[in-house]
Regions:
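Tryptophan-rich substrate-binding surfaces of secreted polymer-degrading and adhesive proteins
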Residues: 1
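Sec-dependent N-terminal signal peptides
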Residues: 4-13
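Extracellular/lumenal and peripheral-membrane lipid-interaction modules
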Residues: 16-174
């Protein structure tokens, strides 16, 4: 029984450990970890002429980039057009906040916005995207994409967070 437990522990750890060297211990954070459910979603925002609802984002790393990407389903209702449903894609750079023991996104860019039942002009789409930018920035500076257990000491030892070969890597060290 003890050998079985040790074997399972080794299999688990080798799946997460990316490398161990003089920089420290580097762990790979899987997409499944990034996509754990958040109690913050769905999120509703009400504006003077429009209301939006954002569903839980699907977070992933696009090959060949050093950014984390997300696709978010959106519901939009305005005074001057019918309710619409769509998706938008965004990307941002990961950073670690030692105080909150969590990984957030900064330098967030809205890459794409599409609605299934609307054919919007490029100018109107750009206006929506520019008005949504502060909302999106606020979301990803306040809601982490990954948290280290608050009761764990690991958050104190995070040295680096980066994307390499389409993997999110967290390096722990002194």
């Amino acid at each position: 029984m003890k050998n079985l437990l040790l074997a399972l522990l080794l299999v688990f750890l080798t799946g997460c450990i990316k490398k161990l060297d003089t920089d420290g211990l580097t762990l790979k954070i899987d997409e499944s970890e990034l996509n754990k459910s958040s109690k913050e979603f769905p999120m509703k925002k009400n504006f003077v002429f429009a209301n939006i609802q954002l569903e839980k984002p699907y977070i992933f790393i696009k090959d060949g980039t050093n950014r984390i990407n997300a696709k978010i389903d959106i519901s939009l209702s305005t005074v001057f057009m019918p309710s619409s449903f769509g998706t938008f894609a965004l990307s941002g750079k990961p950073y670690f906040d030692k105080e909150k023991k969590a990984i957030f996104l900064e330098d967030v860019n809205i890459e794409e916005l599409e609605f299934s039942n609307l054919d919007l002009s490029k100018n109107f789409t750009n206006m929506i995207m520019s008005n949504m930018k502060p909302v999106i920035d606020n979301i990803f500076t306040n809601i982490p994409i990954y948290e280290i257990d608050k009761s764990s000491f690991k958050g104190s030892f995070v040295k680096d967070v980066k994307i390499e070969n389409s993997e999110l890597l967290v390096t722990f060290g002194l």
